[in-house]
Amino acid sequence: MHKLVVAAALALLASSSAYSQNAAPGSARLMTSLPADSGTVTNYYKQNVYDPSDNKIGEIVDVLVDQEGRVNALIIGVGGFLGAGEKDVAVPFSSVRGKKKDNKWWLVMNTTKDALKSAPGYKYDSTKTQWVPEKS
């Protein structure tokens, strides 16, 4: 359920910020083509992240956007087995790059699984509808 809410929020944030900046009140701005440098959230959300040696180091569990609708951080689940014992950490969006490998979209980060495991943990607080630091 949380994932559906996040996807809907991303769509709402992106559309509302674009609307408020580029359109006059009461008029809808429609696109006749897509920006050449655009990507999709689905290329990141719920995707595995690998180190430069192609070892899986985690999975993206959330995509964070600023008030302008720009992606600025990713929450990556690291460690654990089938979600049990997993730790969620935050990384800057710019630290993950995408590449094509074997005709698939791969996300690569120049770090190790151990480095991610040692990073501060975060948990999703549904009452605040945001990620907050885990208490030690």
List each language-model region with its residue ranges.
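Peripheral interaction segments used for macromolecular assembly
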Residues: 2-8, 17-136
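Repetitive helical segments and hydrophobic/amphipathic motifs
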Residues: 11-12
